[in-house]
UniProtKB/Swiss-Prot annotation:
Organism for this UniProt entry: Methylococcus capsulatus (strain ATCC 33009 / NCIMB 11132 / Bath)
UniProt-recorded Gene Ontology molecular function terms: RNA binding
Family: Belongs to the SmpB family.
Function (record text): Required for rescue of stalled ribosomes mediated by trans-translation. Binds to transfer-messenger RNA (tmRNA), required for stable association of tmRNA with ribosomes. tmRNA and SmpB together mimic tRNA shape, replacing the anticodon stem-loop with SmpB. tmRNA is encoded by the ssrA gene; the 2 termini fold to resemble tRNA(Ala) and it encodes a 'tag peptide', a short internal open reading frame. During trans-translation Ala-aminoacylated tmRNA acts like a tRNA, entering the A-site of stalled ribosomes, displacing the stalled mRNA.
GO terms for biological process, alphabetical: trans-translation
Protein name: SsrA-binding protein
Length: 157
């Protein structure tokens, strides 16, 4: 059975599925994005990718790097769009200071998880994450295979 695609204009824009495979997500946060007009139009059209993106903390601010927002030919006629430019993330000061402490002292990393609409504004879900080792990935894959096999047996029996 194929899964349904999200309807145009739905809340979810893009997801970083690779993040859950590569990292243990320990905490999830919502951040706003500073965008240009052509980027908003691209997001409305669903032309965004988070696959190679990452979040960095610089000078007490959070920045999204490597996210690709494909420019629409009709929306970016008077500007030179940069699809992979760095975008500032909007977080509360106490959230930022807590994240800076955990990233610098405890060895966590910040990973973009999904991009979605909330009350007409684009939001980015970021995860405070710890990297998985190779054996952790293998264990997670075995667990998924076992769950799939259990479901198969339950359907037959």
């Amino acid at each position: 059975m194929s899964s349904k695609k999200s309807a145009p204009g739905s809340a979810n824009i893009a997801q970083n599925r690779q993040a859950t495979h590569e990292y243990f997500i320990e905490e999830r946060l919502e951040a706003g994005l500073v965008l240009e007009g052509w980027e908003v139009k691209s997001l409305r059209a669903g032309k965004a990718q988070l696959k190679e993106s990452f979040v960095m903390l610089k000078n007490g601010e959070a920045w999204l790097f490597g996210a690709h927002f494909s420019p629409l030919p009709s929306a970016s006629t008077h500007v030179q769009p940069d699809p992979t430019r760095s975008r500032k993330l909007l977080l509360h000061a106490e959230e930022l200071s807590r994240l800076i402490g955990q990233v610098e002292r405890k060895g966590y990393t910040l990973v973009p998880l999904s991009l979605y609409w909330k009350q007409g504004r684009a939001k980015l879900e970021i995860g405070l994450a710890r990297g998985k080792k190779q054996h952790d990935k293998r264990a997670a894959e075995k667990e998924r295979d076992w769950e799939r096999e259990k479901q198969r047996v339950m359907r037959r029996g």
